[in-house]
């Protein structure tokens, strides 16, 4: 009804006429807007849409080509939809459209040549962030004549190929990247065939670390040749290191962790998801002497003894991601509570921790839930809506919640009550994911009221992820009627992560 009345009001305003029989808005079109306002409107569009706007008229073409709209540019077709047909066209774009305004640039392999890099160095003095994608490369261009490279880079992301050796290129740029603060080396973890045996060290990390002494954030993601010696190499030269991520580097065992913390006194964030950590190496670290605040040890094989030893000695942990670990059981969580080291905890991820009981989780949340901003208790069949209904009144500060498991349960989840409890108790909620099988979700004809309450009470909610099914369609339609088109998403294409809580999250974003 409200939607209908809004439509009537809009149509009435459009039909309004004066005594002369003409609407006062008849001559009000977008053409009347000044260039400054149009430029601001265009800034909300993607570059692909801006290029389409340039075909409308000469004035819009002039605005679309304003360099202020081209500060952050991706020329990777699979990411932005933009494709530059030739190197000559790109050279023209760099000088005519990008120029001093360009801050961030992504280049695919076919556009990474010494001519392009020379032009960027000469015409784009304010370029500070760059991504170079070599993943699809079968052969590099000739860089023997490369004499210049953007020298003000603070952020560099290199997507590595499995078979192309980078040393010929890297050797030419070492003198230009000593100001780097953030380095991403992205491997081919998601594309690698597990049966392949040959592994090539396609980039020389030991030489790279000597050229980048000012690194604060290092992200080595899914690189199959990265091991503990490479971590040791970076720690020997990067004394300002604050964040180290080696997620899905399965050759990392933790053998150099003790040395890492002894050298890197500023290290606050350590992300080691999917690595091959060994308990004896982890227990050798002097955790009580570190200033570590953020730790990810998801999907590692650490023992219960090791987990107790580590967690009870880290003095001020704010972020813990420790899902999919068989050793994380009731005794670990109990010992951690008794140590008193949970007082600073803001984010807890215990996804798929099947050896934790309802009782110990309830005790932990009762004591520390009021301070938690992210709580991930998903992937456990025994954690149902009953436990969540008990702990939600405590999670007053929650910004991120993930609950439910994909496997079919023998019990049903009363989702209307759950939505009502979330809306009532979590006004700061920004991200929510329900992973339960849609066949387990039970809702009534009054579900719209519970969804309305969630939408109205949780005004900061920007992402809600549900499994595909009737309830997903119901919630999606509700939010779309309220013009919140992008909030409700499907588990097949979106997952909620607690990584938003990490202090250096913006620096860790890549690809």
Residue ranges and their predicted role:
Residues 1-221, 227-235, 243, 248, ...:
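N-terminal adaptor-interaction module of cullin-RING ubiquitin ligase components
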Residues 1-18, 24, 82, 89-91, ...:
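C-terminal capping region of solenoid repeat domains
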């Amino acid at each position: 009804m409200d939607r209908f009345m809004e439509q009537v009001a809009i149509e009435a305003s459009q039909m309004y006429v004066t005594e002369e029989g003409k609407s006062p808005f008849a001559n009000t079109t977008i053409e009347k807007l000044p260039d400054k306002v149009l430029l601001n409107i265009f800034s909300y569009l993607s570059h692909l849409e801006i290029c389409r706007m340039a075909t409308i008229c000469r004035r819009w073409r002039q605005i679309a080509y304003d360099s202020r709209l081209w500060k952050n540019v991706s020329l990777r077709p699979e990411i932005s939809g933009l494709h530059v047909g030739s190197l000559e066209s790109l050279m023209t774009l760099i000088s005519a459209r990008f120029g001093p305004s360009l801050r961030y640039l992504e280049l695919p392999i076919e556009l990474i040549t010494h001519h392009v890099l020379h032009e960027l160095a000469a015409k784009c003095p304010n370029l500070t962030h760059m991504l170079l994608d070599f993943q699809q490369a079968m052969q590099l261009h000739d860089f023997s004549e490369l004499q210049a490279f953007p020298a003000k880079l603070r952020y560099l992301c290199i997507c590595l190929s499995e078979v192309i050796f980078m040393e010929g290129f890297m050797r030419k740029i070492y003198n230009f990247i000593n100001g780097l603060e953030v380095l991403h080396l992205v491997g081919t973890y998601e594309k690698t065939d597990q049966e392949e045996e040959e592994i090539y060290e396609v980039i020389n990390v030991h030489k790279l670390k000597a050229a980048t002494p000012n690194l604060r954030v290092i992200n080595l993601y899914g690189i199959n040749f990265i091991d503990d010696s490479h971590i040791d190499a970076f720690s020997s030269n990067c004394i300002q290191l604050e964040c180290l991520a080696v997620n899905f580097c399965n050759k990392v065992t933790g053998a150099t962790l003790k040395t890492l913390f002894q050298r890197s006194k500023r290290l606050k964030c350590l992300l080691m998801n999917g690595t091959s950590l060994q308990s004896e190496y982890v227990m050798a670290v002097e955790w009580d002497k570190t200033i570590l605040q953020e730790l990810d040890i998801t999907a590692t094989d650490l023992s219960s003894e090791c987990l107790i030893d580590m967690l009870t000695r880290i003095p001020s942990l704010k972020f813990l991601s420790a899902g999919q670990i068989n050793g994380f059981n009731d005794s670990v969580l109990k010992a951690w509570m008794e140590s008193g080291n949970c007082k600073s905890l803001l984010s807890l991820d215990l996804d798929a921790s099947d050896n934790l009981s309802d009782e110990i989780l309830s005790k932990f949340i009762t004591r520390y839930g009021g301070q938690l901003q992210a709580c991930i208790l998903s992937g456990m069949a025994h954690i149902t809506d009953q436990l969540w209904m008990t702990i939600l009144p405590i999670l007053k500060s929650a910004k991120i919640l993930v609950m439910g498991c994909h496997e079919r349960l023998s019990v049903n989840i009363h989702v209307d009550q759950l939505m009502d409890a979330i809306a009532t108790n979590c006004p700061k909620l920004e991200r929510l994911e329900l992973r339960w099988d849609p066949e387990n979700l039970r809702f009534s004809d009054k579900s719209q009221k519970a969804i309305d309450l969630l939408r109205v009470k949780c005004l900061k909610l920007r992402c809600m992820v549900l499994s595909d099914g009737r309830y997903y369609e119901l919630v999606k339609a509700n939010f779309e009627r309220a013009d919140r088109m992008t909030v409700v998403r499907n588990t097949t294409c979106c997952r909620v992560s607690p990584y938003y809580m990490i202090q250096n999250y913006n620096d860790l974003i890549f690809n």
